C-alpha cells in the first residue's frame, strides 16, 4: 500500500492492523483493539497460546529518520498503557490472569514488506 500522502493516523492504523495480523499468525487470539479508559489506553489486548494476556503497544514508522519505533514507548506512555491494562482487567474481571506488556514495532516503507519486531515483556507495570 503506498504511504505517500497518508497522514499519521492512517499509517498508525495500518501498523496496528499489520501487528494484529502478525499476532494471529503467531497463534494469538485478539481480545480487543483500541481499548480506552480514563487516563489509559491499550492498542491490542491478545491472549497467547499459553493463556497469558498480552497488552500490546504498537509503534509504527515510515522510516528510521526519527529512530526505532519502539523507542517512542516512553515512561509516560508505559504509565498510560499500564492504567489501561488495569482498567481492562477490572472490566473483564480477570484479576487472577497472567499478563505482560509487549511492544510491536512496525516499519512501513513504500515498496517493501512491513518489518515487524515483537518485543514480549518489553516493560513492567508502570505506576
UniProtKB/Swiss-Prot annotation:
PANTHER family: UPF0102 PROTEIN YRAN. InterPro entries: Restrct_endonuc-II-like, tRNA_endonuc-like_dom_sf, UPF0102_YraN-like. Belongs to the UPF0102 family. One of its GO terms (molecular function) is nucleic acid binding. This is UPF0102 protein Glov_2230. Coiled coil: none annotated. Pfam families: UPF0102. It comes from Trichlorobacter lovleyi (strain ATCC BAA-1151 / DSM 17278 / SZ). The lineage of its organism: Bacteria, Pseudomonadati, Thermodesulfobacteriota, Desulfuromonadia, Geobacterales.
